[in-house]
């Protein structure tokens, strides 16, 4: 029995990797991560005999976040002294190689995903009807369509090269296909810094939003170009890419207000701006955060931009709807559905006036 098997298994699980047993043959192993559909977790483990005779597991592991492999070294819990100087040097070299192997594997995976996405995009229909878009009250800007009626959003870089796709389905279509309503395809795509631009080349102002429906709403309401970042975690990287591509253009991040969350401990609903740390139901740290606001703030800081949130007329009712029924009203598409495009336009223009941003 490997002396630190249970300890290493615990370290990987604590990092979020879903693993039942450990492969210690020194090869790259991919695995799923808690609360995530994709296999973004990885590890490379080896066996090494210590001076005292015990065989220990050594190596590294991590969770992919964009282009960052998140590499961490297996902690040996004060047993490093049991290795010779030569063993420690060999281990250091092996860990460095593991990180390079992880990076190389990720680049190859992303390249395969980009090729598959580009091929699928070329075969998709130029025109179509989308139940998803109809349910959101928005048009399809630069989209293509699947034979089953799904809307397809390209995920591209500043040169227009496609790196992945987002497939949008109505709830009915998702249930029939046994797939999610929003699906990133294919597995392994590189999202970081990639986006979908609506409305042509920005001249002086560019809006940035998370989801397609939100971005489409903003474009329909204002006529301004809008970029889709797809997730809150991608906002900063997309903002950097856009600022580099369109120098001198102001970037306004139109954030999702993810104030309604669930406690990680008891799964009860709460409002994170009213309970900053502990859950009001179980008293434990809820470990929840307003990802939309945090992501938008980070993006604005990166590019000297600004942020804004949708302002609902009856915000108390919006909050109560989440706490009592789990109904989330978070973005400008929700505002569009409840109060109309004219309200969205008025709020954006008011924010631009407040910032003293105007066309030259």
Residue ranges and their predicted role:
Residues 131-148:
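Short, basic/aromatic recognition patches
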Residues 67, 146, 157:
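Acidic surface patches and DE-rich sequence motifs
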Residues 78-81, 169-172, 315:
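A short, sequence-level motif marking secondary-structure junctions
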Residues 14-17, 138, 305-306:
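Short aromatic/hydrophobic-glycine micro-motifs
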Residues 1-132, 258, 265, 269-271:
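Non-catalytic accessory segments of DNA primases and related replication-initiation nucleases
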């Amino acid at each position: 029995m490997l002396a630190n098997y249970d300890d290493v298994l615990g370290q990987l699980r604590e990092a979020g990797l879903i693993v039942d047993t450990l492969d210690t043959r020194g090869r790259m192993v991919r695995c799923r991560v808690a609360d995530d559909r994709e296999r973004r977790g990885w590890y490379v483990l080896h066996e090494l005999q210590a001076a005292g005779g015990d065989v220990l597991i050594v190596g590294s592991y991590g969770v992919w976040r964009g282009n960052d492999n998140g590499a961490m070294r297996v902690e040996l819990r004060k047993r490093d002294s049991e290795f010779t100087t030569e063993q420690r040097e060999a281990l250091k070299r092996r860990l460095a190689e593991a990180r390079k192997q992880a990076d190389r594997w990720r680049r190859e995976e992303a390249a395969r995903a980009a090729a598959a996405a580009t091929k699928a995009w070329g075969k998709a229909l130029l025109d179509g009807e989308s139940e998803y878009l109809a349910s959101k009250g928005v048009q399809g800007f630069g989209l293509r369509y699947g034979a089953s009626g799904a809307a397809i959003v390209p995920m591209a870089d500043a040169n227009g090269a496609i790196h992945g796709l987002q497939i949008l389905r109505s709830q009915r279509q998702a249930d029939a296909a046994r797939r999610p309503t929003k699906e990133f395809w294919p597995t392994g795509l590189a999202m970081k810094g990639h986006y979908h631009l609506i409305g042509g080349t920005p001249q002086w102002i560019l809006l940035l939003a998370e989801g397609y429906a939100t971005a489409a709403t903003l474009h329909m309401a204002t006529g301004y170009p809008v970029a889709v970042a797809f997730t809150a975690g991608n906002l900063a990287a997309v903002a950097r890419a856009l600022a580099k591509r369109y120098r001198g253009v102001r970037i306004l991040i139109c954030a999702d207000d993810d104030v309604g969350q669930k406690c990680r401990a008891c799964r009860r609903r709460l409002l994170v701006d009213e309970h900053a740390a502990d859950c009001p139901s179980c008293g434990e740290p809820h470990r929840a955060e307003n990802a939309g606001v945090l992501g938008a703030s980070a993006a604005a800081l990166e590019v000297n931009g600004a942020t804004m949130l949708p302002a609902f007329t009856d915000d108390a009712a919006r909050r109560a709807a989440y706490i009592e029924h789990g109904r989330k009203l978070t973005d400008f598409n929700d505002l569009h559905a409840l109060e109309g495009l004219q309200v969205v336009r008025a709020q954006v223009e008011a924010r631009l006036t407040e910032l003293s941003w105007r066309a030259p």
